[in-house]
């Protein structure tokens, strides 16, 4: 397992437990392991109850954190992938298709970063091209045609900023998705599972409900990008994060996010199954409420929700 800098003391204890577990088991060894286990639990509860916003960002990028493909088979069943935008190509930074959630059909779409070097290159580190956004929109329109709810998983450092992406209409593709998603006639639930950065996240992030995993973030720019603009150096990222209000808890307070999905102690990477179960429960609950509304009622609430963003008050 990989550890972050603020987890060094937890690593020391877990290394000791691992070392002792390989020793011949006797009463003394078992007792020592139990003591260390209790100490580890207390340390973890203390550490994760007072995380800084920057530490939350670090957890959202943890190399062992579950990505969309990891969660797909744990949350849904009977997934059938659909490919291509029917105009240019098949962007592998986004994966989508038909699936079942608790035996009910849904259209699921998610950004995939890739785990190792080969898969990261294959999925372009989760940075979508215009054809990716058009592919996602094609699947959403298909879901609308067959009256299926849509569930999107957001995990990206941003839309791909390359010249070819700009030539193929990156900004138009994202803007088109914002327009079309705001008027879809089926329930739409969006979940930030890691990084939700800039227009790259917004391109599949407009819906009736926006959920976030506990240790994820949602922002118009990365902390490093913000620090580079304000302080001319990315090294100030940890400082600017605190004032950006980009973590799940802060965004829930600001009523940008509808619900925060709890993660296992220590983060989602420590228990994929529990994380997936929490996501499944949260999504199913939201879809149940949304499915009971009429199209007119649901779209009116979606419109009111979107128009409420950007409120301000004088200090």
UniProtKB/Swiss-Prot annotation:
EC number assigned by the record: 2.1.3.15
Record-level GO BP terms: fatty acid biosynthetic process; malonyl-CoA biosynthetic process
Xref: SUPFAM superfamilies: ClpP/crotonase
Gene Ontology CC: one annotated term: acetyl-CoA carboxylase complex
Keyword S-adenosyl-L-methionine: no
Pathway: Lipid metabolism; malonyl-CoA biosynthesis; malonyl-CoA from acetyl-CoA: step 1/1
InterPro entries cross-referenced by the UniProt entry: Acetyl_CoA_COase_a_su, ClpP/crotonase-like_dom_sf, COA_CT_C
Subcellular localization(s) per the UniProt record: Cytoplasm
Alphabetical keyword list: ATP-binding, Cytoplasm, Fatty acid biosynthesis, Fatty acid metabolism, Lipid biosynthesis, Lipid metabolism, Nucleotide-binding, Transferase
Catalytic activity: N(6)-carboxybiotinyl-L-lysyl-[protein] + acetyl-CoA = N(6)-biotinyl-L-lysyl-[protein] + malonyl-CoA
Domain CoA carboxyltransferase C-terminal: 36-289
Molecular function terms, GO-annotated: acetyl-CoA carboxylase activity; ATP binding; carboxyl- or carbamoyltransferase activity
Functional summary from the UniProt entry: Component of the acetyl coenzyme A carboxylase (ACC) complex. First, biotin carboxylase catalyzes the carboxylation of biotin on its carrier protein (BCCP) and then the CO(2) group is transferred by the carboxyltransferase to acetyl-CoA to form malonyl-CoA.
Summary of subunit composition and partner proteins: Acetyl-CoA carboxylase is a heterohexamer composed of biotin carboxyl carrier protein (AccB), biotin carboxylase (AccC) and two subunits each of ACCase subunit alpha (AccA) and ACCase subunit beta (AccD).
Family of the protein in this entry: Belongs to the AccA family.
Protein name (database record): Acetyl-coenzyme A carboxylase carboxyl transferase subunit alpha
